UniProtKB/Swiss-Prot annotation, chains A, B:
Cross-referenced PANTHER family: DIAMINOPIMELATE EPIMERASE (PTHR31689:SF0), DIAMINOPIMELATE EPIMERASE, CHLOROPLASTIC (PTHR31689)
Keyword field: Amino-acid biosynthesis, Cytoplasm, Isomerase, Lysine biosynthesis
Function noted in UniProt: Catalyzes the stereoinversion of LL-2,6-diaminopimelate (L,L-DAP) to meso-diaminopimelate (meso-DAP), a precursor of L-lysine.
Family: Belongs to the diaminopimelate epimerase family.
Gene that encodes the chain: dapF
Active-site residues annotated for this sequence: C73 (proton donor), C196 (proton acceptor)
Name listed for the protein in its UniProt record: Diaminopimelate epimerase
Amino acid sequence: MQFWKVHGARNDFVLVDETEEEVVPESDKPDFARWACDRRSGVGADGVVFIRSDPPSVEMRIFNRDGSEAEFCGNAARCVVKYVTEVRGENVKILRTLSGAHRVEVQGGWIAVEVPEAEIKKVVELGYEVDAGVPHFVRLTERDPIHDFGGLTDEAKTIFSEYEPKGGVNVTYAAPSVDELRVRTFERGVGWTPACGSGVVAASLVYSEIFGPFEEVSVRTAGGCLRVSLSDGPLLIGRAEIVYKGELRGDWRENTDHQRRRHSLSRSPSGRPRLQECR
Amino acid sequence: MQFWKVHGARNDFVLVDETEEEVVPESDKPDFARWACDRRSGVGADGVVFIRSDPPSVEMRIFNRDGSEAEFCGNAARCVVKYVTEVRGENVKILRTLSGAHRVEVQGGWIAVEVPEAEIKKVVELGYEVDAGVPHFVRLTERDPIHDFGGLTDEAKTIFSEYEPKGGVNVTYAAPSVDELRVRTFERGVGWTPACGSGVVAASLVYSEIFGPFEEVSVRTAGGCLRVSLSDGPLLIGRAEIVYKGELRGDWRENTDHQRRRHSLSRSPSGRPRLQECR
């Protein structure tokens, strides 16, 4: 079984091309995602994307590390467009996902992806409630959220827990500096990540509202540089990298470590993990 | 450039076969290790092993994530023997490393590797100072070090710091249960790891000294089951897995993220990280 390892702003994915044929049966997709994302005994990634290319559009489905299916991811979208363009040599304009159709465009080494409209819903004491397709609490800070985010963790957890009754929130810190915005997000269910696409868009909107208006905002994240075009879309613009092509050896379902960990995560009657015999 | 992703008890490695020719120039090997081990923009691994097979022996060199070269690693050794046996179809009896020659043997699905002799140097109040090729402080515990190790971290750090003036020590916790020993190690410079080969050997020696003597000890780690034959070698016996074959796309040196992170880790005169322009 063939796959590709790709990343956008250090948000990394296993990409499986199912254009010619289904490679992982539908019912196996969640378990494959759990296995493939395991960084030590699988391939190692934040998620798995399955694609079907049908120029001028391409379909992308994305599964998280826990096997759940997500609607959309800006970083994954760029990787898919880069793959279809450079590996399949095809030209695509539309990316189809569970969250609908998104305009995409290759701009030299950069890839632009139309992302859900972002809107400031409420201004509160500590920051801004923003809907960017997913809920964000944008907090302006003078600290450097890229290198100095450790000290922000407790506050981020406090803000997160206040919104937990309403399904929780992604807490995005933004530090305006001379010619760019430095952003890092404490993501719901994940924690700090190198670069959260919707967080970058939410922070750019608030930045433009207070200091702008700006047509385009240049954002630095721990995963690299992104740009947000607010006047057109909005568009999330960034790079993507195709790191390598892989060929699995043997059937991933037979992978002993995956079986052992699935087996050991099942609970014995006493509630303790049931561990296989050390044979 | 071709590589293989392998793991032994969830201690994972990028394997580069240089039998036919040098694949990564000597001077690039440390930098390649730093790039390849990066779990998001590289391949992702604990280390990189370079091998040259010359039956009945095989040479293994191993580089850590930080680019430093290590002398030996039991988990990596099993992966190398599995690769030479199953992928190259060759029969090897001796593994050559910086720490010398090690007897190796394939036993069905298990692989036995001769590891450095282990010796209890001193018995102190909290545990046992053991030389297993590398220094270990073995501490017996009633807690389950596989699932319940969080609570042991502070103590492990305290013990580690007491030995820091003497170069530090790996702190290995061992919990004897009915028919097996449960072991986890707080490794020098790394922290908790799924399975440390020398830690498993050190703990087995102490276990045999107190409750034995035993010819062979069965050990459960967070990375799976290992066995230690004390009467013969000693031998560290365990499984290994070849997960996939990979083909890098383009030159890893040109990998923009690796360049960006190397560039951004260089310091400007003020001491702050020097960050590339967000172009």
